A protein has these predicted regions:
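Extended, low-polarity transmembrane helix blocks
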Residues: 1-41, 88-245
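Homeobox/homeodomain signature
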Residues: 10-16, 22, 51, 57, ...
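Short, glycine/acidic-rich beta->alpha junctions
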Residues: 15, 72-74, 85-86
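Solvent-exposed, well-ordered loop and adjacent helix/strand elements within mature globular domains
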Residues: 31-71
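Short beta-strand segments in beta-sandwich/barrel cores
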Residues: 38, 81-82
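Hydrophobic, membrane-inserted alpha-helices
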Residues: 55, 72-81, 97-105
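Short, amphipathic, aromatic/basic-enriched membrane-interface segments that mark the entry/exit
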Residues: 59-66, 83-92
């Protein structure tokens, strides 16, 4: 048995790992319940304006009728499965592709909620890893003969895993910091938020032009980003020319 497998089996029998697993299940379920209820009741999911890239997507999704309701039912079902210990693995299997899609969508539209969706995705991956002893049989990887070391369900250790939780804190901090610098400009959640952000930019004119392109002209995100990059380049060239003079 490898050291990684030994660590896994030890973790399954650790009280603090089990507490963290329960926390992840509850937190991820709570992330789906409000949005699921909104969809089932036939209400619009967010207050994002239709001109916002993600708001435009949600507007189109809202117009799909019972498909919109179906998504809400799926989210509520997934949340319920996560909260029930016997069905938690099935809930995690359903949760992962859903949150992966949401996370990619958030990054593609430069939504402000990328931090939350990233942490939710990492949480779902953790839950799948927690039940590795049950899902390993469908994975295309070579498995060692660890049948003699079943994953322990009973608590056999109360030792606090400082290294693991230190890694969790470091991961959360990394997600927050990376998301601050990953995009040089975002559309914000409204025109006001976008314009307030562009005033503090080194290229305020280009940034404000980007906000105007998104919210007033209603152009696609890719088109506005291209215009922003061209305008930013002109500002940079003008600044260099002024410095050389």
């Amino acid at each position: 048995m490898s050291k990684l497998e030994q660590f896994y089996f030890d973790a399954k029998g650790n009280r603090w790992f089990q507490y963290f697993t329960v926390f992840c299940r509850i937190a991820l379920a709570l992330g789906f319940i409000p949005s699921g209820i909104v969809k089932v009741t036939g209400e619009r999911f967010t207050a994002l304006p239709a001109e916002h890239p993600l708001g435009h997507y949600f507007d189109a999704l809202f117009q799909t009728g019972y498909y919109y309701t179906f998504i809400g039912i799926g989210q509520l079902l997934t949340a319920a499965l996560l909260l029930i210990p016997r069905t938690a693995l099935l809930g995690a299997l359903l949760y992962f592709p859903t949150i992966l899609n949401i996370c990619v969508l958030a990054y593609a539209t430069r939504f402000e909620g990328t931090r939350i969706t990233t942490l939710m995705l990492l949480g779902s991956i953790y839950l799948l890893c927690w039940d590795y002893d049950r899902v390993k049989y469908i994975l295309p990887f070579k498995r060692s003969n660890a049948a003699a070391y079943p994953a322990k369900k009973k608590i056999i250790s109360n030792r606090f895993p400082f290294l693991f939780f230190g890694g969790v804190i470091l991961t959360i901090a990394s997600v927050i910091i990376i998301n601050i610098f990953i995009f040089d400009i975002r559309p914000g959640n409204s025109l006001e938020e976008c314009t307030n952000g562009c005033k503090g930019s080194n290229y305020a004119k280009s940034a404000c032009g980007f906000c105007d392109c998104i919210y007033n002209k209603g152009k696609p995100l890719d088109s506005c980003l291209k215009e922003y990059k061209r305008a930013k380049q002109r500002e940079m060239d003008s600044l260099k020319t002024a410095i050389n003079k």
